[in-house]
């Protein structure tokens, strides 16, 4: 039996979660109707807060994997609904390996799809950065005419965000500026690029998958330190895009593409039946007890 886990960091804002993560799940269930699909939050603290607040319960990654084992599911496909391979993603990957190599659960395969920003487009690999920029620009196109688009990442230092800016500058989206709230590229550096572009009209788009109330208040709220207020103070005319990237249907399709790649890869590397394989541990991507990719 096969199962799919849709894994995000999580949020306590139910409406925003359903518009983003929920929409992706609906597409996954439609495409893979023969598989069990589960939603998990990678933040245990958010799992606890969500389950205290709402009747519809959310599982942690560990709980979902244990439940799959009880149901007899032995092939698991995990699609992280995350921008980058951050600390939560790495921790989830370690947990997945432990489940795969444990005789207690009986998993033959555990396959992990890519986060949104992974492949650079070299050596015939897909360019996730260019595809993401194209998906954003295509979705906001009607409100972005004759404007610079400012992408705000709500996070700290991630090389992926700097790479996204470089990809934009090298031609994928020359009117796009990227900055992070607590890291690099900085807001001040974004102002320098905006000054060079010469546009006085801006569209600010959150580079976050879930458009929570808290995030939108930070972007366009009446507080003096909102991104809207700071840009207006610099003399710009500012519009705010009030959606997380997870609500963008083109971004949703990129996650579906990554999930499909993980499923196809597992089919190509399908191991021999478990009873005919000696339980030998190796460092290769294909293990004697199963696979993780």
Protein language model features and the residues they cover:
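Extended amphipathic ligand-handling, pore-lining, and cofactor/metal-binding catalytic surfaces
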Residues: 1-203, 208-293
């Amino acid at each position: 039996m096969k199962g799919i886990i849709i894994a995000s960091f999580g949020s306590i804002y139910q409406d925003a979660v359903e518009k983003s993560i929920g929409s992706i799940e609906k597409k996954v269930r439609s495409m893979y109707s023969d598989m069990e699909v589960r939603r998990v939050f990678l933040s245990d603290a958010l799992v606890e807060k969500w389950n205290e607040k709402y009747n519809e319960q959310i599982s942690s990654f560990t709980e979902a994997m244990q439940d799959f084992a009880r149901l007899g599911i032995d092939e698991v496909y995990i699609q992280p609904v995350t921008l980058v391979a951050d600390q939560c993603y790495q921790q989830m990957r370690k947990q997945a390996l432990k489940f795969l190599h444990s005789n207690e659960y009986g998993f033959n395969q555990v396959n992990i799809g890519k986060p949104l920003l992974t492949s650079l487009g070299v050596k015939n690999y897909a360019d996730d950065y260019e595809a993401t920029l194209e998906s954003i620009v295509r979705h906001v196109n009607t409100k972005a005419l004759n404007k610079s688009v400012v992408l705000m990442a709500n996070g700290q230092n991630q090389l992926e965000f700097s790479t996204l800016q470089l990809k934009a500058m090298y031609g994928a989206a020359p009117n796009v500026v990227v900055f992070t709230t607590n890291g690099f590229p900085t807001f001040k550096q974004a102002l320098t690029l905006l000054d060079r572009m010469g546009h006085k009209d801006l569209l600010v788009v959150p580079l976050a998958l879930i458009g929570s109330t808290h995030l939108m208040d930070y972007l366009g709220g009446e507080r003096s330190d909102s991104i809207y207020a700071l840009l207006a103070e610099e003399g710009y005319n500012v519009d705010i895009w009030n959606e997380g990237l997870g609500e963008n249907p083109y971004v949703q399709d990129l996650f579906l593409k990554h999930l499909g790649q993980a499923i196809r890869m597992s089919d190509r590397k399908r191991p021999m039946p478990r009873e005919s394989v000696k339980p030998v541990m190796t460092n290769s991507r294909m293990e004697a007890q199963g696979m993780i990719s």
